[in-house]
């Protein structure tokens, strides 16, 4: 961004003071992340109060601050400030104002799983358009989305916004800020059933995106979810395109055929109308066929050429802890998929494990959260899949992970049960030898990267 404090305050209708006008180059809500020229927004929350860190923000070079406590002006002898009622509301208003100053394609990305990987694919595909601003990390909520939008620069050519959801109305709220003209929904899974009760309710929440797609816009939807999203399709004014990463739906606009997993990634044949093209992905997991297709659909609709699509996908590197494969000092191959877990990604990760060359195949599998009524059957299903794929050794971590282990054990797998990550590490230390391949995967709350860190020394 390249706006002054006065311009921002006047546009949004807030009182302000400027002793020395400076151009704001960014926005921060964490004083430790402030860069020279940033506008520091002091947020008040239940756990902390950003006003306590005004001095640190100014010492790090903040060009101005946004406060909701008037007494901070004298306490910290503030020179450049905007006085607001609520820092979070200000941040959202600022983002909405900045977004509407830019005549660029804005793409909203949501779905039960695969949002971040799909965003990574889309960012790579849109790079041919020029400067693309993309959600960093998991900045996909009511604070993260505005912070992403505040990264817009005069030369930005596209904006990709990941949108998370933990209840009805949240996608709607984020769309009011970002106003996406393009969108994609990766899938309607069982994650969040604990919060929303059913896949139908999850579909309703995710499909809040559709109402914001204008007549000139496009949304890409997973053909496997046709029945779930059907009630909400009429809310979309724009064009709907369907993609299918399973190779089963010949009616999908974008579909994959001849999917082949290998040790270094995945290849498949992309089909769109009469067009046929081989796609080479240097990433693992058959679920990434669907994720890449969703990104291809939007990129193609935005005018990215087929040749550029093929070349860009060869170079994609996904956000960390998503099927990262590395060799430990002791010669063990480690597959780090510890960022998060759901039933489909668990089964896909097990498939990646079994496609690796090497010695014995070991799966360290932990709890999957927020599955609601599907909790027991989903964990049991993963255990059966481990047995079907003939995993040599399963280490089941956690109370829910034990359901995976019991199911795998009943189906013939060798299984050890660990109450926590430390016990899982002890089992691995006693079992592993050079050339064994280990998959580590569980929900974010399990923090199973601790196991990976131990394995990697």
Residue ranges and their predicted role:
Residues 8, 38, 57, 94, ...:
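Residue-level signal for inorganic ion chemistry
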Residues 47, 319, 338-413:
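Active-site beta-alpha connecting loops in nucleotide-dependent enzymes
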Residues 71-76, 184-333, 358-359, 384-387, ...:
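Acidic, Mg2+-coordinating active-site environments of NTP-dependent enzymes
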Residues 190-196, 335, 368-373, 440:
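A short acidic, helix-capping loop that chelates divalent metal ions and anchors anionic groups
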Residues 82-86, 415-424:
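Short acidic-hydrophobic, aromatic-tinged amphipathic segments that line or gate anion-handling sites
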Residues 6-10, 89-223, 227-236, 430, ...:
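Phosphate-binding loop of NTP-binding sites
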Residues 1-93, 97, 356, 384-385, ...:
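N-terminal leader/targeting and accessory segments in enzymes
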Residues 109, 320-324, 445-453:
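ATP-dependent carboxylate/acyl-activation modules
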